[in-house]
């Protein structure tokens, strides 16, 4: 039985972010729809050919998405929210963009669909909306068209579909409450139709993704898999595909299904290959996810070979990435600035395809010399001075319980802060960043390329900070920010100023829609060689009598939004970052900055997928935040910001952070998230986001007032702040001014109404 290679998916955006540029040009009205579609076709063709040349036997088709693959599935099923529907019921690419970005077919504003994290990754999906009695039909044939494209190019392919049970699990009920699982019988005919169309095209295998099978699902949801797959059986071979965790706890459910193969993530799960082999039906194919699709590290192929070799020849076997390579940068070969030693430790998506080919060849032949050669740099890394810092390890070992305790409880601190800042009721602020204009980006780029000297760069940044302060004072905001003109990305900026990180030139990965991020890579112990944010915060504060917030990205978020080391625990990395940023808090305070925001938007998304593993993670995650913040004096107000969050199941931990003020993203969920804070009787101050910064829509004064009144029904008004959902980096100045002016006006109206 010859072993084959395949990937579960490939990055969509292009090596030079071609998809992002084409999307944004189309949205701005600068290019035609046909030009956008052409870019998509070219990217797909290139990526299929690149994977094939790298040694992939079965190419994924259907992993490409114009915005998000869950949203693509919604369109496939005809699941379009009423507010985004065309009058004639037709569906096109503009429908898809309206759902993701927030527009009605008329061009009028309409709330975008909710967006949240894809399991525990840094990718976001558009949450499907379900209503009672909803109808489904095949309305969007993108998958079939792309299958035809790939077949016309002569490729051997494996279409990819998001499975029906996971699709329902990922969605939310809108309107009258009901059990969304009851819709399963209604969506299955569409899946049957799609599989029939694939069978007509001669497709042998379909990858059907059911990552919900790695979760601790309610029994009713586990029970739903059997009837669902009974309905889908018989037209093509189905590779039931799971990832991000192991499947052993749900294996009894899985082995009862009428599928022909199972993909398991052997990186992030604890599944034992021998046990899987023993328990799976003898005629099933096992797809072994041996190469990590979520990181940038070169794999120890000798270890992978040993992990799987015992079952070679005993059952049909494929080797694969653990999950889609969507979460990895595309190509290491274009990284020209990484030094040779560090570069030898990495593998990006194309190199991971090459790793799979090496592994396949060794497993098929029994010859392992190439694996040993490939894995040699990994042995060298274990002893590199770039990795270990004795001073950091010593400081980490010396942490005590006192290091994570503020001097006094919140009630005492709040009195000191009220006396210091004398803020009005409904105080207004923003989350941190202001629009990153072409001028700002050009300034940073010129400095980075050496076309601008340090003095001129600093003069330019200072001018943008000054303008941000002037704008905020003109708008009448109460607590100001410096606008972060000097920062490219909230994690990358800190990583650049901390020892232990390295950066890539083209290591882009998709975050959502057209947004891409270039995560730093943690290669060693982390420390702060010098202050990072103090100079610009101090300068901004010198321009105004109003308080200016110091802005830090928190330790758990820096960890979660970086590619972490694999040789130490995530807890170790988080606490090393916390100690480095603790020194930054002390320096900001000494420089006269009275309000310091420590953003932790990633705290919840870092949760393990299984609830039984949550407590240990939350314990060290909260401790890391507190180590970071606890050096602050009582009169220094510590803020934190979180977004894309569901809080009700971690409220104890949110409260345990002991931040004086928490700002959260709530507008897309119509203040639903505040239910958690009300039920918990959250004791500190809260800023519920009053408008969605991911949408270009400008909220009206009335809209914001209505949201704030709704918030005040749940949280005492004296503890409420007024702010947008998130930073304003991706917006333009005209819409930012208009939205903030309406926000400030709404706050003033509520003060007068008291």
UniProtKB/Swiss-Prot annotation:
Provide an example Pfam family for this protein: Meth_synt_1
**Could you tell me the superkingdom of the organism this chain comes from?**
Bacteria
Specify which residues bind L-methionine according to the UniProt entry for this protein.
431-433, 484, 599
Keyword Zinc applies: yes
Which InterPro entries has this protein been placed in? Cbl-indep_Met_Synth_N, Cobalamin-indep_Met_synthase, Met_Synth_C/arc, UROD/MetE-like_sf
What does this protein need as cofactor?
A: Zn(2+)
Record's cofactor remark: Binds 1 zinc ion per subunit.
Pathway given for this chain reads: Amino-acid biosynthesis; L-methionine biosynthesis via de novo pathway; L-methionine from L-homocysteine (MetE route): step 1/1
Which GO terms of type biological process are on file? methionine biosynthetic process; methylation
Positions of Zn(2+) binding: 641, 643, 665, 726
The protein's annotated catalytic reaction(s) are: 5-methyltetrahydropteroyltri-L-glutamate + L-homocysteine = tetrahydropteroyltri-L-glutamate + L-methionine
Q: What class of enzyme is it?
A: transferase
Name the residues annotated as catalytic in the UniProt entry: 694
Query: Which residues make up the binding site for 5-methyltetrahydropteroyltri-L-glutamate?
Result: 17-20, 117, 515-516, 561, 605
Q: What is its EC number?
A: 2.1.1.14
Question: What does the entry list as the binding residues for L-homocysteine?
Answer: 431-433, 484, 599
Gene3D superfamilies, A to Z? 3.20.20.210
Q: What does it do?
A: Catalyzes the transfer of a methyl group from 5-methyltetrahydrofolate to homocysteine resulting in methionine formation.
> What protein name does the entry list?
5-methyltetrahydropteroyltriglutamate--homocysteine methyltransferase
Q: Which gene encodes it?
A: metE
